[in-house]
């Protein structure tokens, strides 16, 4: 047993609120007096339908989702949405646009290009322009007005990049399709600025196994009839999200997280905490005199995934090892980037971030 509190900085599946885990533990084998677990519950039972309904309504309230938007709890992760969004929304259009700002938006662009006859245009490429150290401003995106949509990722978990202001396009432009997997519920934004939002749950929503999709109702008219029903948004909505058996336990856990976030004061309150957490780490990095390195442009630094490194890979490995011995876990950076990555999603308490900052200063004192 560790002598230190354990803080999980994993990029995903990620830390869950302690209060949520306690509730799940208490209800594990006997949900609400039923005598059995949610994992054993029929997805068509009144009990589970109530869980699903409350999860949807709580998410709608937290994000202020307008009435003309539908919410789905699907499977397959955000990577499935790379294809599903294009298959459903690009039908009948000559082009659709994509913005590449890092690892995941690059993969999305590549995947979208495979499964549709529509040409997927590059509206901007942060790798070519900035070597993934800055973000192409929205006003520089080369968007074709008659494109089916514009796809982008607002936060790049691997590269540690995030748009400071959540992007929006002017009226008359194509709808925005946004991968919000790693930042949804972390700050306020206007859902009405988007045509479709999707997010894998395993970062800011709940455990892996469910993917949230929020889609504007009029866009469902685009869904073609010649794609498999399981990949058709309209098919899922026509069956009230029950086209196939949903990820019942992951939805239940996500609902607990929504209730926890409401108890914290909602998205506005958690946004202020998230800002302070990120500020704490970036001030530690910038105040290290170059011992810790983060080359991201200050205006493009992620408040969810703080990436940094030292002057050598050997020292990086020592940092990760010694941090884990002090209860600061899963700080190793993504394999293609290296270094360290501290993922500080909603459920990461400020105390955990302060403990990491203290360790960083102590590590620098000993090895700097």
Curated annotation (Swiss-Prot):
Disulfide bonds: none annotated. NCBIfam families: PRK05355.1, serC_1. Keywords: Amino-acid biosynthesis, Aminotransferase, Cytoplasm, Pyridoxal phosphate, Pyridoxine biosynthesis, Serine biosynthesis, Transferase. GO terms for biological process: L-serine biosynthetic process; pyridoxine biosynthetic process. It comes from Neisseria gonorrhoeae (strain ATCC 700825 / FA 1090). The keyword Cytoplasm applies. Homodimer. The modification N6-(pyridoxal phosphate)lysine is found at residue 203. One of its GO terms (molecular function) is pyridoxal phosphate binding. InterPro entries: Aminotrans_V_dom, Aminotrans_V_PyrdxlP_BS, Pser_aminoTfrase, PyrdxlP-dep_Trfase, PyrdxlP-dep_Trfase_major, PyrdxlP-dep_Trfase_small. Belongs to the class-V pyridoxal-phosphate-dependent aminotransferase family. SerC subfamily. GO terms for cellular component: cytoplasm. Its cofactor is pyridoxal 5'-phosphate. This is Phosphoserine aminotransferase. Binds 1 pyridoxal phosphate per subunit. The lineage of its organism: Bacteria, Pseudomonadati, Pseudomonadota, Betaproteobacteria, Neisseriales. Pyridoxal 5'-phosphate binds at residues 78-79, 104, 157, 179, 202, 244-245. Pathway: Amino-acid biosynthesis; L-serine biosynthesis; L-serine from 3-phospho-D-glycerate: step 2/3; Cofactor biosynthesis; pyridoxine 5'-phosphate biosynthesis; pyridoxine 5'-phosphate from D-erythrose 4-phosphate: step 3/5. It catalyses: O-phospho-L-serine + 2-oxoglutarate = 3-phosphooxypyruvate + L-glutamate; 4-(phosphooxy)-L-threonine + 2-oxoglutarate = (R)-3-hydroxy-2-oxo-4-phosphooxybutanoate + L-glutamate.
